[in-house]
Amino acid sequence: MSVEAYGPSSQTLTFLDTEEAELLGADTQGSEFEFTDFTLPSQTQTQGQTQSQLDNQVNGPDGVLPNGEDAVGKTSQLLAELNFEEDEEDTYYTKDLPVHACSYCGIHDPACVVYCNTSKKWFCNGRGNTSGSHIVNHLVRAKCKEVTLHKDGPLGETVLECYNCGCRNVFLLGFIPAKADSVVVLLCRQPCASQSSLKDINWDSSQWQPLIQDRCFLSWLVKIPSEQEQLRARQITAQQINKLEELWKENPTATLEDLEKPGVDEEPQHVLLRYEDAYQYQNIFGPLVKLEADYDKKLKESQTQDNITVRWDLGLNKKRIAYFTLPKTDSGDMRLMQGDEICLRYKGDMAPLWKGIGHVIKVPDNYGDEIAIELRSSAGAPVEVPHNFQVDFVWKSTSFDRMQSALKTFAVDETSVSGYIYHKLLGHEVEDVIIKCQLPKRFTAQGLPDLNHSQVYAVKTVLQRPLSLIQGPPGTGKTVTSATIVYHLARQGNGPVLVCAPSNIAVDQLTEKIHQTGLKVVRLCAKSREAIDSPVSFLALHNQIRNMDSMPELQKLQQLKDETGELSSSDEKRYRALKRTAERELLMNADVICCTCVGAGDPRLAKMQFRSILIDESTQATEPECMVPVVLGAKQLILVGDHCQLGPVVMCKKAAKAGLSQSLFERLVVLGIRPIRLQVQYRMHPALSAFPSNIFYEGSLQNGVTAADRLKKGFDFQWPQPDKPMFFYVTQGQEEIASSGTSYLNRTEAANVEKITTRLLKAGAKPDQIGIITPYEGQRSYLVQYMQFSGSLHTKLYQEVEIASVDAFQGREKDFIILSCVRANEHQGIGFLNDPRRLNVALTRARYGVIIVGNPKALSKQPLWNHLLNYYKEQKVLVEGPLNNLRESLMQFSKPRKLVNTINPGARFMSTAMYDAREAMIPGSVYDRSSTGRPSNMYFQTHDQVGMIGTGPNPMGSLNIPIPFNLVMPPMPPPGYLGQVNGPAAGRGAPKGKTGGRGGRQRNRGTGNHGSGQPNMPNSQASQDLVSQPFSQGPLTQGYITMSQPSQMSQPGLSQPELSQDSYLGDEFKSQMDVALSQDSTYQGERAYQHGGVTGLSQY
């Protein structure tokens, strides 16, 4: 069957530009290689077509055919025949199959099947119901790479390998036609095919092509089964294949029938939006944390590497350091980080067998692939021997144990959080409170830059609230704002403030800023990271202890330990006791303690209580991760992040699908807590900020820098439009599967990226001012090698240019960014480039200029990319041709659909995994759509002076989008002090007892019950968000956005709100719905109920 049969124009198959249903978009850094489903017409579809054909022949209302036959009778006869044929096919493929039959579908033509050398199974080169052939599907999912052809096939029993070096990785292999002879030579992509001096001058390396194209083996190598063969074969879906592959890991002899057995592939319970109590919360999140832990353990323990060569060295602290290189892998699965624990074993016979544990102190970078580990103890280490070592990755459960412990503490310990935060986090409706505090006269902190109007508003509001969300779009001074908030909280004198973030880099950046204010800051890091240098090492707890003058005995013991390497047992005991005392003293006297979210579970903090807690980058942390610091006594909690950028990393797809990939920040937004958005960006040239602002932030970003500020002196680069430092460079290359089998690369794009980088360097840019980013690890790895071997300038220059994945670049910036899109195919889709949050991150890293290299034909099929390409074309920066003579591309694109939902902007970029039908169907919940009533017009005419919200008619009824009602109602007068209750809504739906304490575990079962017929209205958030702010300015123009076409926000036939979906989103974001996202948006919605036969607003 030809590949063309599967094209978009095919009438036989329906193309769905989607990833697998179970591969969630929110799993932002999971596997990059996904399989797009094709759907063969099912039996019912075929029958439906037959019926419609007959209907077309029916003449008149009586359903009589022209020849007088009864139409119904004729149809029944045809259907019976169709069913009979299907039965025949069933029996054909349930009979005994030969050993070499495809393990998925049963096709057994020797010319069509390939043997997987690793799994010892046969697979065909047909696609069936999936986009990739069955053999490629298996190789990718099982992470296998070596194959053998069938002995009765046209090429005989052949193991596919490189002619030059013997490499058997089929994802690396390709062929070169020999010029003289009618033969082809198999060579690996790197290094053999890229070598300038190939063995035989008849080989033209420029003709090299991969053996796997369009996700199947080339048809001359392995025949593709005919359409008839594939139709008669066992039909298997991508989802079944995925489950079968998982089953094979446990039981290699499992079959499709085993999938039907009870207990196989049980799905975990899905996360909820609201929880009855903390026990239910723990019972849902605990199993998800365990799933992720088990997956992580299996992944780490499967990474054993043999035959490692070690280079030994001695560190300044007298500890042994082992340097080694691991075999090249670009799978992206193994994320080796500084501080990780590694076990090194000697397996040879030149010295006694030995085993040592060490911590990673250096990871591969552009300068080299070497890894360095510092050994805990060097006793018996065979330092004279370099060869025959084995590396094992030691899995540590610490992070997951601390998450589980936090979930338990939240459930059983009354003092872990305040009553208000307890109920807010569980989604209970409680009265909003204002904290009575002395506001500073000047909000800017000493040692930090002056704040702009939106930053001042954020600081002022946060200080008065027990729970706040701050949304910081790219370059809006999120770190400065957070540091200023921490400064004012610390000045209030309520004990140390705890500051956390998911990553060590984010913690270090914030620690540095807070230190500039003059506060006493302690950076608490894991003991495994104490040897790792960072910009704030001098603030680290272990280093501050070294410099304590108040404990001379500790200093003497420390000096002795440094000189000798070890202490006697009695001295060691005394040293540890003194060290613990010093640590406690430093921590208790600190103004601010900074650590990672998981680091907050450190035993050294166990006895401490923190009234105020700030979590930066909270949208990149899973919810249990956020709970680790929260349960240390939070009475005032501030979450900072941006849900329009990439979310948490969840490796286990099952856990991600169940909602572990949802951040706490996002869930609270959905519950109706409006984030305070920072509005002035100081990073990007105004021309670079226009598109992200209009598409991702409803035009609310204002520019804190001018075009003149972003003109680089001594930089001579010819931009296609001198006033717009950006362009899209049209590249017509083809994507290839990378050597890991789980990622992609594009050689043509890599060559163009090198040319552009060289041009930027020649124009005066320094190497460290350029960042090259790509969504795919395969392309990142290929680019690093390509620049080294093929760059026309000195190798050292290219080494200093940072090449990273888009995900790794979040939170970073460079003067110039080159984005390589990689994807270029006829009908496979664009994979996880579909994720709009990834595009947002990619476009907002640059300060002075952005260059995108990609294939517009492939990208324009996705509506958001189509929007970007249209925008670049309108700006006359969609270009092609040689770099020294760029010309405008004549490529045409379809008119972009309207992407901005004026009713509920920005929400489409949030992955809402926590919604399920149970939540949506609860009568009276915020998603209750049982009524069609509309509020009177007075509730539509809202004016938010903070965000400059315009007024307009409300098409909510047709959009089927749930909006939390508390964002619509007029403001209540703010309470005067903590715990004060105002108005008739007092106590409605609030937990029993005072708001300041946890009160009862059970919610008020009267008006506050989810199951009640009458919805229960939370106190209005508007009281805190609709505060007058004279500094607010209007948004950037949105003139170029097409506004004419109506917004198609829900799929036809879907009535439940949790199934509504933005029209442009790919399948990765199915189940996305618009929800209230930010302070700068028009929040209008209906939440009516039937009362006494009259539809009206519920009592406020």
Curated annotation (Swiss-Prot):
Binding site for Zn(2+) 2: 116, 119, 138, 144
Residues at which Zn(2+) 3 binds: 162, 165, 188, 192
A GO term, aspect molecular function: DNA binding
Comp. bias (Polar residues): 1012-1063
EC class name: hydrolase
Key word Hydrolase present: yes
Thylakoid among keywords: no
A GO biological process held by the record: chordate embryonic development
Region feature CC/SHH/C, mapped onto this chain: 116-144
EC number of this enzyme: 3.6.4.-
Residues where ATP binds: 455, 475-479, 645, 682, 813
Ranges for region Disordered: 42-67, 978-1065
Skewed-composition ranges (Low complexity): 42-53, 982-993
GO cellular component: cytoplasm; nucleus; P-body; perinuclear region of cytoplasm
Entry keywords, A to Z: ATP-binding, Cytoplasm, Helicase, Hydrolase, Metal-binding, Methylation, Nonsense-mediated mRNA decay, Nucleotide-binding, Nucleus, RNA-binding, Zinc, Zinc-finger
Gene3D superfamilies tied to this protein: 2.40.30.230, 6.10.140.1240, P-loop containing nucleotide triphosphate hydrolases
Job description of the protein: RNA-dependent helicase and ATPase required for nonsense-mediated decay (NMD) of mRNAs containing premature stop codons. Is recruited to mRNAs upon translation termination and undergoes a cycle of phosphorylation and dephosphorylation; its phosphorylation appears to be a key step in NMD. The formation of an upf1-upf2-upf3 surveillance complex is believed to activate NMD.
Protein's UniProt name: Regulator of nonsense transcripts 1
Source taxonomy: Eukaryota, Metazoa, Chordata, Craniata, Vertebrata
